[in-house]
C-alpha cells in the first residue's frame, strides 16, 4: 500500500517536472536575450538632448520627448540599437527643429557605432565639425535642408564605409577635399543647391557611385574624362553650374547611365554621340541652356532608349535629322530657342509615343503637316514664335488628349474647317494669340466646356463674343485683347464661375459692365480698356476680395466713384487705372483707408494654387502663374508702356483725365507701398496733402493740370525713389523743394505755376518766378514795372514841387498866428478836461 502511494507520488513529481521542462523549451532554444542600451550610449543621447533643445515650432513626428532615464534608450523615438550589443547604430531626428550648431565636442560624436545618421530639416547652423570623422562606421549621412556653412572637413575621408551622402540645400562652399577619394563604397552623392566651387572633382576612384547630383552650385571646370571609369553610374546631374568645355560625350560610353542632366552651364561647340552603341540605356538627356551649336548629328539614332530629349536654349541650326524617327520611345522632345529652320520634318510625326513636343522660338515655317495628327498621345504642343501659316492644325480640335496648345506669334489666319471635335470634357489650355486669325470666334468653341486658359488676343477677330462662353464655368483666364470684337459683353460670371482673369481691352464693346461679375469670387484681373462701355463706376467690385488689377481706362464711364452706402474700398487692389473717362465728384478724405494691399509689403508667396491640378505649387514673382502671366499697358513715367509681366509688388493708381474735384484725400498717404500715382487732368483744388511724403517708395507723381494751390510739401523732397515729377499747370507757389529728386526734373514739370520759385538751376533764365514769400513787404519788381514806376514818379514830380512852394510860403508868412491859435485852443481843452 505504502509502495503504491510512493509510486503515485513519484509519478506526480515526474509529470510536474516534465511540464515545467516543456515550458522552458522556448527560452532554451531561443536566441540570446536582446541587450539593453548601454549606459554610455544613453548618457550621450541625454547630453545630445540638452544640446538640441525642443523648439516651439518643431515637428511632433520625431522628437526627444520620449528620451528619459526610466526607459531603455533603445526604445526611444528616433533611436535604433544593435540587438546584440546595445550600441546605438541609427539616429533619426528628421524635422527636429534644433536651431543650433554642431560643435566638435558634441555628444553626438560619442556615438561611435552609428551607421545611420539623419538630421535633415533641423535648422542646423555653422560648420560641419571635423569630429564627424570619428563616426567611422557611418554608411548613411543626411544633413540636407539645414543652414550649414563652410567647407567639407578633410576628416570626411575617414568615413570609408559611407554609401550615401545627402547635403541638399545648405550653404556649404569651397572645394570638395581630396580625401573624398577614400569613400570608395559611396553609392549616392547629393550636393544640390550649395555653394561649392573649384575645379576638378575627385570622383573617378569612387567606382561604386550610381547617383551624382552636383546641381545648383558654382563648380567651374571641365568634366573630367576619368568619370568614364564609373561603370556603375546611373544618374549624373550637374545643372546650374559653370562647367565649360566641349560636350562630354565620353559619358555616353558608360553602359549603366540612364539619366544625364547638363543644363544651365557653359558647354560649347558641336554635340556628338561618340561611339554610342545601340545597347545604350540612356533614357533622359538634358543639355538645355548651354552654348552648343552646329547640326544635330544623325548618330542620335543610336540612343534608342531615350524617352526625354532636351536640347532647348542653344544655338543648334539646320534641320532636325530624319534619323530622329528611330527614337521610338521618346515621350518628350524639346527643341525650343534654337535656329532650326525649314518645314517640320515628317520624321518627328513617326514618334507615336510623344506626349510633349516643343518646337517654339525657331525658324520653322510653312503649313503644319497634317501628319501631326498621327501623334495620338500628344498632350502638350508648343509651336509658338515661328513662321507657321495657313489654318490651325485640325488635330488640335480633334484630339482627345491634347490639353495644352501654344501657337502664338505665328501667321495662322484661319480656324480651318471643323469636321470632328475631340473629347469635350477635357480641360484645355490654348494660346493662339498674336496671329492673323480673321472672322468671328466660332460658336463650336463652346462645345469645349472646360477651358482653364484661352487666349485669342492680338488677332483680327470681329463680330460679337459668343454668349455661350458664359456656360464655361471652368474658365480661369480669358484673353480677347486687341481685336475688333463688338456688341455686348456676355455674363461670364454665372454661379460657380472660376474666372480669375479677363482681358477684353482694345475692342469695340458697348453697353454696361455686367453686374454678374460680382459672382466672380476668384476674379483677380479685369481689363476693359479702350472700348465704348458706358456705365457708372462699378463700386460693387469692391466685394471681390481677390481683385488685384482693375483697368477701365479710355471708355465712357461717368459719374462719381464713391457711394457712401456701397463703398467698401479695394483691399486687395495693386493696380487701378480708371483714366480718360468722365468720372466726376469729390473723394472723401478716407477714400483710400481700406486699400490695405497698397500699404502692405509684397512678399513672394511660398505657395500658390495650380488651378488646373488643384494643388499647391511654388509661388511666382509675377501676377498670373508660371504658365500664363498677366500683362498690362499703362502710362508709366509719362510714356505708354506695355508690361508683358506684372511684378507682384508693382502698385499703381491712375485717375488722370477725368473731372474729379475737391481736395486730394489725405488718406492717400496710407498707401506706403505705392509706386506710381497719376491724378493729372482733373479739377482737384486745395493744397497738395503733406501725407504724400509718407509714400516712401513712390517713383512717379503726376498732379499736373489741376487747380491745386499752396506750396509743394517739403517732405516730398525726401522721397529718394521719386524720379518722375509733374506739377505743371496748377496755382502752386513758394519755394520748390531743393533736393536731388526735384533738381533732376525737366523745367516743364513746373511750368504754369507763376508763383513758384527756386527753379534757377532747372529752368535757367527761361523761368525765374517771383520769390513772394521771402520779403512780402518789398516785392521784387520786373524791369518793365520799374520803368513804369519811374515814369509815374516823373509825372508826379512837377505838381509836387509847386504844391510844396505854396505851402512853404503860407507856413513861413503866417506861422506865428496859426501856431498860437492851434496850440492855445488845444491847451484850453486840456485844462477844462482836468479841472
Curated annotation (Swiss-Prot):
Topology of this chain in the membrane: Single-pass type I membrane protein
InterPro entries for the chain: Leu-rich_rpt, Leu-rich_rpt_typical-subtyp, LRR_dom_sf, LRR_N_plant-typ, LRR_R13L4/SHOC2-like
Q: Which UniProt keywords apply?
A: Cell membrane, Glycoprotein, Leucine-rich repeat, Membrane, Receptor, Repeat, Signal, Transmembrane, Transmembrane helix
Query: Which Gene3D superfamilies does its entry note?
Result: Ribonuclease Inhibitor (3.80.10.10)
- This chain is glycosylated at 57, 68, 99, 134, 182, 205, 220, 275, 377, 462, 471, 482, 594, 678, 707, 726, 746
- One Gene Ontology CC term in the entry: plasma membrane
Q: Which family does it belong to?
A: Belongs to the RLP family.
Q: Which PANTHER family does the record associate with it?
A: LEUCINE-RICH REPEAT-CONTAINING N-TERMINAL PLANT-TYPE DOMAIN-CONTAINING PROTEIN (PTHR48052:SF85), UNNAMED PRODUCT (PTHR48052)
- The name this protein goes by in its record: Receptor-like protein 37
What is the species of this protein?
Arabidopsis thaliana
